[in-house]
From Swiss-Prot:
One of its GO terms (biological process) is regulation of macrophage chemotaxis. GO terms for cellular component: cytoplasm; Golgi apparatus; mitochondrion; nucleus; plasma membrane. The modification Phosphoserine is found at S375, S380, S393, S621, S1143, S1164, S1185, S1195, S1199, S1201, S1203, S1204, S1208. Residues 370-379, 446-455 have a biased composition (Basic and acidic residues). This is Microtubule-associated tumor suppressor 1 homolog.
């Protein structure tokens, strides 16, 4: 119904449904700690108190893991029931102990399991143990359960006060451990378990005011619809306790520790007369999951049925799956029938301590007497008791899913069948069972072999690989478990196929079983490699319970002949033929043709009409079809493949007119996926209860006429009626959705190139059925019709073909099983009216018509699957053609490669020759270069020596010439320099003298102007001070005047006050005068306040006036100072102009000085010429020359010095 069923939780838990003698159902979830921590269940019965049953789950200390469970705090809740309204005096006490370590929601990290004793007192505390306290939850009208926290240990005590004997039943069940915590199994196996269980304690109050507090796990995935506790008068009590456990394999051959035990159930007689082990089941189911793989939900459940036979209204205590879990494993074991007289005709298979090495296995034994079970499921009760032994092995390995049959001596014999397992089998699996009543049997499955740490099993998070035997065998086991005394237990177990998410792997599920030996002989039982969900077929009459199963088992064994065909056309013919056969069977079922010729024909008329015998025939046909498929496609599964099994249970709400009946409908999907070995059991919330009224199908009723009449409760009709109508609407809408979008044959082929298997979704929803049994119609509503199987990684090898064939097989089985998936097997009294049968027949016809349309839809889907298969063949042919082309290209390329190699050899030889020639040439070249270098060096040295000689000679000549000239120039320059220095010093002194005079004049003028400005400033300051003093005096005078006026006014006020006081005294008796006086006083006060304010304002005005005067004076002063500053600026400007003029004059003087220096130079040159002439000239007049030359030399100097003005420094 809900697509998010697999997404709601990732945990595994159990939902327990408990019934008292008044058929008051109660539910609770419990999670199993033994999913990581192995648990051993010990059941104790006393012959004195034969109904006392103790089921103790003890944690197996053999498992070596990093964490263990610490459960020290017990949470006890007693469920007290009043006296039953029947001829039995019953007192029901349900005590549930939940040992809690912490309050955090359902976080349990268990690695090192400890012993959990029967009293649930001691569990060794270890790290990271988190349990949640158990919180009560009440069933609401909207069918939602309020969730509490996860109980870790549940102990149910029920004490019955009966006429025959009293019965005390104590169930101690362990909860699922949390997912997400590593379980370190020996052999490098790490188990990661996550648990997000939200516990649901469902407290329900029956109409007769009996109190039922129920604890359980609510996964928030389903709304359990109208789960009403209906009191009945049949005194049948059913306990359904589901336990998710890792089962322990007890095999001496394999020395792997880390054994996980499902439970040991012992029957113990305290009087010492008889003390035997009724059933001991040690089953190992370890989930191996590759990293990063998502898997659908799974559930682990353990089912115990204990029936007290001496009373005609016996009590059934059944631990049945009643939870929907996403990550876990579904391990269903049933407790043998326990009778009051101490006799238990139990068929408990004992695994021989054999050589098998099964990776994940399951043994399921359902042994029930036929109490009327009230359950809210799709289907009704099943009359016969069932025993289902299922060995679940992992894909990829040839294991031994065993099948159980009946030997000549009445014992059960297990035939070895080959199963697919993921781990290699060291020795061929050999499993044999011998099932006899009241004998100590032990299930010994092989321990876990050494596994990779990489393939860490996610016990709750990954799919479980558990192949189960064919359903033909399960039907025989169903019939064989109950002896002559077992007459009262019916288990409604209808597998509801959920093909929502199925990979293209081997997928198979069980179908309904035939009840007659003749039908079993006609139908070959398939050899199921993937596993099949145990669904007990229509129950036989009680007289045939011990005889019919053996013949059925033999007939089914004879019919199991694998047909080996490998051709594709043969496979398609098989598919079409099987589809036609299924169609004919469904049509016969819809027409209600009886085909059962058993001794119980009187009680099975309606059973035959519902098509229960055809279920077996269809089962046989599907089985043969599956055998043929196995023969056609014998593909070896790889070790990485995984077999995914999903149990889906549906809850259907039944109308109160028919009583609320819950059928147990586990649906098993097995999928072989590569890259991992995964085990998952997904139990879609399965409600098991005892029906308060007569069953819907009278043909399936037992020989008890009283059990139906006692359960008739008209009081509940008014309560459950509207809810039943609502359920009917919901079921109609859901059935339409299932017929349209979620058909069981939607096959999605595997994409082999990507290495991942696409999800093949199969989902089958049974249409709504309305059954009428005497009083009113019975509506069955599928509550959880589908489960999700997540994508598993697969290698693109052979299993893809096999998965496709098995997908067709599962679809074929879904087609066969859908018309009968809603068959209701209940107990009806033999005195049912014929009118009721006719009404039921009409309803069945309408149902079959609706189902015939669904079958046509399935045919269409099958044809589509055939077309898809043909498309796959075309793709394969295309790939083969491409492969041939690639081979051709490979040949051509190989030839080219050979030719290229030859060329390479020739080229390499030529290259070697060339390298040798190059080496010779290089040596010759180096010798020649060396010779040239030597010759060049000799020539260069000779030329260098010559150049040095020439250079040195020339340098000596030039140096001598240069030295002579340099001396001459030095003497001349020295003379000129001395002359210039003397002239410059004279001019400098003159300029400095003139400049100092000018500076002194400027200083004098500045001082005079500054003194004048200071004088004027002082005069202004004095005048301002005088004005200020005058104004202060005037203001003081005004202040004095105001003060005098104020004093006068105060005196007047005082006199007036005195007058008013006198007046008040005179007119004290006049109220108006008093009022006026008060007014005057108030006015005076106001006037005083105003006067004060005015005075303050006057003071402020005075200050403001003073400030104004000061400001005006300051403004005037500021103006004056600004004027003075402007005058000073003007003077500075004048000084600047004068300094500029002086600088220009100085520049002119410098120019004239330069001119004079030039003239001096010229004169000196002339002087030198004259001197030279004197030395070299005429000797006659030597005296004239110096005098004449001295005069011109001096005259220009003197003229220049006197004419040049003095230059003052700037």
């Amino acid at each position: 119904m809900n697509d998010d069923n697999s997404d709601r939780t990732e945990d595994g838990s159990r939902y327990v449904f408990i019934r008292d003698k008044n058929s008051n159902p109660s539910e609770y979830y419990q999670t199993s700690l033994s999913a990581q921590c192995p648990s051993v269940s010990h059941g104790d019965w006393n012959s004195d108190n034969p109904d006392a049953m103790v089921v103790d789950y003890e944690m197996d200390p053999a498992v070596d893991s990093s964490e263990s469970v610490s459960l020290s705090h017990q949470c006890v809740e007693e469920l007290a029931y009043p006296e039953p309204s029947s001829d039995f005096m019953g007192k029901h006490e349900f005590t549930m102990y939940s040992e809690l370590t912490c309050q955090s929601p359902a976080l349990v990290n268990t690695g090192k399991p400890q012993d959990l004793h029967s009293n649930c007192d001691s569990l060794e505390a270890i790290q990271d143990e988190k349990f949640d306290p158990l919180k009560p939850c009440e069933c609401r009208s909207d069918d939602d359960y309020a969730c509490g926290d996860s109980p870790e240990v549940l102990e149910l005590k029920q004490t019955y006060g009966m006429k025959v004997d009293t019965a005390n039943y104590t169930f101690i069940a362990r909860h699922d451990i949390e997912q997400g915590q590593p379980l370190h199994a020996p052999g490098g196996l790490q188990t990661t378990v996550r648990d997000r269980n939200a516990l649901s304690s469902c407290g329900r109050t029956p109409p007769h005011s009996s109190k039922m507090y129920v604890r359980g796990v609510n996964y928030n995935r389903e709304n359990f619809e109208n789960l009403q506790a209906t009191p009945s008068k049949t005194l049948n009590t059913t306990f359904t306790v589901i336990s998710d456990v890792l089962m322990q394999t007890d095999s001496p051959d394999v020395g792997v520790q880390g054994q996980n035990s499902l439970g040991n159930v012992t029957k113990e007689y305290t009087d010492g007369t008889r003390r035997g082990l009724i059933g001991e089941k040690e089953i190992q189911a370890v989930t191996l999951v590759s990293d990063g793989m998502e898997v659908p939900n799974g559930s682990a459940s353990q089912e115990f049925y204990c029936v007290s036979e001496d009373d005609p209204n016996s009590e059934t205590h059944s631990h049945g799956p009643y939870a929907q879990q996403e990550m876990g494993q579904n391990l269903r074991g049933t407790l043998p029938n326990c009778h009051v007289d101490g006799e238990c005709p139990v068929l408990v298979p004992a695994f021989e301590k054999s050589k098998t090495r099964v990776l994940g296995s399951e043994c399921k034994v359902t042994v029930t007497e036929d109490p009327h079970i009230d359950s809210h499921d799709n289907d009704s009760d099943i009359q016969s008791s069932t025993e289902e032994l299922t060995l679940r092995s992992v894909s990829g390995q040839r294991g031994s899913p065993y099948e159980m049959g009946w030997g000549e001596n009445g014992g059960a014999i297990c035939t070895d069948k080959a199963g697919c397992m993921s781990t290699p089998v060291e020795q061929p699996p050999n499993l044999s069972f011998r099932l006899e009543p009241a004998e100590v049997k032990k299930y010994n499955n092989v321990e876990n072999g050494p596994r990779d740490a990489k393939r860490a099993p996610n016990l709750k998070g990954e799919p479980t690989n558990m192949p189960k035997p064919n359903l033909g065998k399960s039907a025989t086991k169903t019939n064989t478990t109950v002896g002559s005394k077992v007459r009262k237990t019916e288990i409604i177990s209808y597998p509801t196929p959920n093909f929502k998410n199925i990979k293209a792997k081997v997928i198979s599920r069980s179908v309904l079983q035939p009840k007659d030996t003749s039908i079993m002989k006609d139908t070959p039982s398939p050899q199921v490699t993937g596993g099949s969900s145990p669904s007990p077929g229509p129950s036989k009459h009680l007289t045939m319970m011990n005889k019919a199963p053996r013949s059925d088992f033999k007939a089914s064994k004879k019919a199991e002949i694998p047909i080996n065909k490998t051709h594709k056309q043969q496979f398609n013919k098989l598919i079409t033929s099987q589809a036609a056969q299924v169609t004919t069977h469904s049509k016969n079922a819809s027409l209600g043709v009886p085909r059962t010729t058993s001794a119980t024909k009187s009680n099975q008329e309606n059973v035959d009409k519902t098509g229960s015998p055809h279920a077996g025939s269809e089962t046989g046909s599907v089985a043969a079809f599956f055998q043929k498929i196995k023969g056609i496609l014998p593909v070896k599964m790889k070790s990485s493949e995984c077999l995914e099994v999903t149990y889906v249970s549906h809850i259907d709400q039944i109308s109160p007119e028919k009583g609320e009946q819950d059928g147990e409908a586990p649906m098993e999907k097995q999928e072989l996926g590569k890259q991992a070995t995964n085990e998952i059991f997904e139990s879609k919330s399965l409600l098991v209860g005892s029906a308060p009224k007569t069953s819907t199908t009278p043909g399936r009723s037992s020989s008890k006429p009283d059990s139906r009449s006692l359960r008739k409760t008209p009081g509940l009709k008014a309560k459950v009626g509207p809810t039943a109508a609502c359920l009917r609407r919901k079921s109609e809408s859901r059935t339409l959705g299932s017929d349209r979008a979620l058909s069981p044959q939607r096959i999605r082929r595997v994409s082999g190139s990507g290495g991942h298997a696409a999800i093949n979704k199969y989902e089958e929803k049974p249409p709504k059925q309305a059954f009428q049994n005497g009083s009113g119609p019975l509506y069955l509503k599928p509550l959880v019709p589908r489960a999700h199987s997540h994508l598993l990684k697969t290698s693109p090898k052979g299993p893809s073909r096999k998965s496709l064939f098995t997908a067709f097989n599962s679809v074929e089985k879904g087609r066969q099983k859908n018309p009968r998936s809603l068959c209701i097997q209940t107990q009806t009294a033999p005195d049912v009216l014929s009118s009721e049968r006719t009404l039921e027949l009409a309803q069945y016809k309408t149902k079959c018509e609706s189902q015939s349309g669904f079958i046509l839809h399935l045919r269409q889907l099958l044809s589509r699957g055939n077309t898809k298969f043909e498309a796959l063949t075309v793709v394969i042919q295309h790939l083969l053609s491409e492969r041939e082309e690639a081979l051709k290209q490979h040949k051509t390329l190989s030839q080219e490669l050979v030719s290229l190699r030859g060329e390479l050899v020739a080229a390499s030889s030529a290259c070697e020759k060339l390298e040798k020639a190059r080496a010779d040439l290089q040596t010759a070249y180096q010798e020649f270069v060396q010779k040239l270098n030597q010759q060049h060096q000799t020539d260069r040295t000779e030329l260098e020596n010559r150049l040095k000689d020439l250079y040195t000679a020339e340098c000596e000549k030039l140096q001598s010439i240069y030295i002579e000239e340099a001396e001459k120039y030095k003497t001349q320059l020295q003379e000129q320099f001395d002359n210039l220095n003397a002239a410059h010093e004279t001019t400098k002194l003159e300029i400095e003298a003139s400049h100092s005079e000018k500076v002194e004049l400027l200083k004098k003028t500045y001082e005079t102007s500054l003194s004048e400005i200071k004088k004027s400033h002082e005069m202004e300051k004095k005048s301002l001070e005088d004005l200020l003093n005058e104004k202060q005096e005037s203001l003081e005078k005004q202040i004095n005047d105001l003060k005098s006026e104020n004093d006068a006014l105060n005196e007047r006020l005082k006199s007036e006050e005195q007058k008013q006081l006198s007046r008040e005294k005179a007119n004290s008796k006049n109220p108006q005068v008093m009022y006026l006086e008060q007014e005057l006083e108030s006015l005076k006060a106001v006037l005083e306040i105003k006067n004060e304010k005015l005075h303050q304002q006057d003071m402020k005005l005075m200050k403001m006036e003073k400030l104004v005067d000061n400001n005006t004076a300051l403004v005037d002063k500021l103006k004056r100072f600004q004027q003075e500053n402007e005058e000073l600026k003007a003077r500075m400007d004048k000084h600047m102009a004068i300094s500029r003029q002086l600088s220009t004059e100085q520049a002119a003087l410098q120019e004239s000085l330069e001119k004079e220096s030039k003239v001096n130079k010229r004169l000196s040159m002339e002087n030198e010429e004259l001197l030279w002439k004197l030395h070299n000239g005429d000797l006659c007049s030597p005296k004239r020359s110096p005098t004449s030359s001295a005069i011109p030399f001096q005259s220009p100097r003197n003229s220049g010095s006197f004419s040049s003005p003095s230059i003052s420094p700037r």
